[in-house]
């Protein structure tokens, strides 16, 4: 039997807590920073992978900027572009935060669907306000 997923369905991710994790070749996983950050409304941040890790074939993203006012651990999207598995050990430095001071305070600091996250959080795109507006128009 086939099933389909619409953007209104939440995907349940399997949580893995181990001292090491093997990312198979050409595979994607979600991870979480150890650090819990609280950004004031005049500082933004983004995450950059470390060069040594990138040279192993591990791509690290965090879906863009960490918004001013964000509080929580940052979810990372990790992709192994290598043809071999990559083993990551707990507490290994794989990325770094870059903090940017803004010229002024944010008009609307972050209070979104990921605020206060303490763990790896899957996509909550189904909670996007523009998606909800489109769904209501169709009804």
Each language-model region and where it sits:
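DUTPase catalytic domain/fold
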Residues: 1-139
